[in-house]
């Protein structure tokens, strides 16, 4: 059977280990959550067909390891990305403080043609933990960070409960489309599958 021609949009998810990158991806693609996911080794990806404005395209979502020893894999995985999703745990100040490092790492490794306008989306995950009583990063602080980076969209999610995950990825898909360089590829009818972690989201200014 001949392959179908689709528009492929590549999305990279970055953030510290344990913030819920895998769970977010799996909740969005497979509508599933598990506490049993192992740490991602290197990188993995899932794909999902999405329809937007009467167009069908394939969203290829890359889940990368948060451990520093795997960051050297970045060039191969980051190149060609149409959108970068930065994820932190609202219950971990360190994961929030490391966002600048992840953003800079991506810009260096991916070398986008227009770094000033490259689309990023920020997700504050695990808002469900301890009913929010363990939270250490306020929504105000996160939005201030987004404002300092050119008013990038911000969502607060729970991959476990599924809160705002769909909304966040709808925004991510729109930003990926708007980023311009859509890559037309011939893809087989089979779809790769990957892994998962935790999250949730709020408002998008797309």
Curated annotation (Swiss-Prot):
Keywords: Endosome, GTP-binding, Lipoprotein, Membrane, Methylation, Nucleotide-binding, Prenylation, Protein transport, Transport, Vacuole. The modification Cysteine methyl ester is found at residue 206. The keyword GTP-binding applies. A motif (Effector region) lies at residues 37-45. Essential for trafficking from prevacuolar compartments to vacuoles. Involved in the trafficking of newly synthesized protein to vacuoles. Essential for plant growth. Participates in the recruitment of the core retromer components to the endosomal membrane by interacting with VPS35A. NCBIfam families: small_GTP. This is Ras-related protein RABG3f. The lineage of its organism: Eukaryota, Viridiplantae, Streptophyta, Embryophyta, Tracheophyta. The gene is RABG3F.
């Amino acid at each position: 059977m001949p392959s179908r021609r689709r528009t492929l949009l590549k999305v990279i998810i970055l953030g510290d280990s344990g913030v819920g990158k895998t769970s977010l991806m799996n909740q969005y693609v497979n509508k599933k959550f598990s506490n049993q996911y192992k740490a991602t080794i290197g990188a993995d990806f899932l794909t999902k067909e999405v329809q937007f404005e009467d167009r069908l395209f394939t969203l290829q979502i890359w889940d990368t390891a948060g451990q520093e020893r795997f960051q050297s894999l970045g060039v191969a995985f980051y190149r060609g990305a149409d959108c970068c999703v930065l994820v932190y745990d609202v219950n971990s100040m360190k994961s929030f403080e490391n966002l600048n490092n992840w953003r800079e790492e991506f810009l260096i490794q991916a070398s986008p043609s227009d770094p000033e306008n490259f689309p990023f989306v920020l997700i504050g995950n695990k808002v469900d933990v301890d009913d929010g009583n363990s939270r250490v990063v306020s929504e105000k602080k996160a939005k201030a960070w987004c404002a300092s980076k050119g008013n990038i969209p911000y969502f607060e999610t729970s991959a476990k409960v599924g809160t705002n995950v769909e909304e966040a990825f709808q925004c991510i898909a729109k930003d990926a489309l708007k980023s311009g360089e859509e890559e037309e590829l011939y893809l087989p009818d089979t779809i790769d599958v990957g892994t998962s972690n935790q999250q949730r989201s709020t408002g998008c200014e797309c």
